[in-house]
UniProtKB/Swiss-Prot annotation:
Organism of provenance: Synechococcus sp. (strain CC9605)
Domain of life where this protein originates: Bacteria
Compartments, record wording: Cell inner membrane
Protein name: Phospho-N-acetylmuramoyl-pentapeptide-transferase
Keyword Iron-sulfur part of the UniProt annotation: no
Cofactor annotation: Mg(2+)
EC number: 2.7.8.13
Pfam families membership: Glycos_transf_4, MraY_sig1
Length: 350
């Protein structure tokens, strides 16, 4: 699956949804956001280059990535606001507008946290920015504020909707779970952003999948949150024009953290945690590969400080790279898997 084919699939899917799903208006926010994001990135990337926002590549990473050094990062700054602003203007309904505003603030807060992390990395001339603990604390504070507003307004269900009419009642446990979901999803999308076009393509597909299942649930669906999803999908497709191999810019933590926050925020507000888990399976796999790699290495570490490794390198996409599969093959394969998981999530929607 090439980038052009992925874009065509998402576009045609939105047109088909508008035609066949009652109350669906998915293609307009997708198209407007895609065009605007393509333009803002085209204008902004040369500016990032002039400001010397070049990415540093870690030496222990795949050797083929060393040629990417100096590619402008913080590209999320150019497209996330496009998706957020356009997505927030979808509806005139008062309650839906308040939800979209809170979702926009959460997304932009994570973009800011990612931006601080990226900037810290650039000023230190390394591939590491904020400390893991410091970044996690900032993310937790932003998420807690979002959840507090949602709790006050009664926006989040205390049970998780599952397929076949089933529900998993959680009561007050939904709140710590909500915190975990936002932190886990944002860091999972961050880990996925390691190859040209990988996270932006997968993100566009998952946003589209969430929008479709939102419109297929209930009598009239949820056009406000579905429209927000399509605006975000369009923003990432617009960025993909510049981020596909060879990438002219990277989204950085600025974009990847915001992507995960937006996905999880939509899922929490719409009781779509199950669809997000299924459709975002690539994000889950990338994150689990890192957790497994670290845990096994520490558990088997000997006196020499060396331990066993389950994967050649984590996250998972590097495992395939070091196995001899080139980047231009790994990325489309992951897109294809994500597309399959989106279809599965639609079949198994609550």
């Amino acid at each position: 699956m090439t980038a052009s084919l992925l874009m065509l699939v998402v576009l045609m899917t939105s047109f088909a949804a508008d035609k066949w799903i009652t109350n669906a208006q998915l293609s307009l926010p997708l198209l407007i956001a895609a065009v605007c994001a393509t333009a803002t990135a085209a204008v902004g990337i040369p500016l990032l280059r002039r400001l010397k926002m070049g990415q540093f590549i870690r030496e222990e990473g795949p050797k083929t990535h060393q040629s990417k050094a100096g590619t402008p990062t913080m590209g999320g700054l150019l497209v996330v606001p496009v998706g957020v602003v356009l997505g927030s203007l979808i509806t005139r309904d008062a309650v839906a507008s308040q939800q979209l505003l809170s979702l926009a603030v959460l997304t932009l807060a994570f973009m800011l946290i990612g931006g601080i992390d990226d900037w810290s990395s650039l000023t230190k001339h390394t591939n590491t920015g904020l400390t893991a603990r410091g970044k996690l604390l900032l993310q937790a504070m932003a998420t807690a504020a979002f959840l507090a507003i949602a709790a006050w307004q009664g926006w989040i269900s205390s049970s998780i909707a599952l397929p076949f009419g089933l529900e998993l009642p959680l009561g007050l446990m939904i709140w710590p779970l909500g915190l975990f979901v936002v932190l886990a999803e944002s860091n999972a999308t961050n880990l996925t952003d390691g190859l040209d076009g990988l996270a932006s393509g997968c993100g566009a597909l998952v946003f589209t999948g969430l929008a479709l299942q939102l419109m297929l649930r209930g009598d009239n669906g949820d056009p406000a949150l579905a429209g927000f999803c399509m605006a975000m999908a369009g923003a990432w497709l617009g960025f993909l024009v510049h981020n596909r191999n060879p990438a002219r810019a990277f989204m950085g933590d600025t974009g990847s953290l915001a992507m995960g926050a937006a996905l999880s925020g939509v899922a929490l507000l719409s009781n779509s945690l199950w669809p997000l888990l299924v459709m975002g399976g690539v994000f889950v796999a990338e994150s689990l590969s890192v957790i497994i790699q670290v845990w096994v290495f520490k558990a088997t570490k000997g006196p020499d400080g060396q331990g066993r490794r389950v994967f050649r390198m984590a996250p998972l996409h590097h495992h395939f790279e070091l196995g001899g599969t080139d980047e231009q093959s790994v990325v489309p394969a992951f897109w294809l898997v994500t597309a399959g998981l989106v279809l599965l999530g639609l079949v198994l929607r609550p």
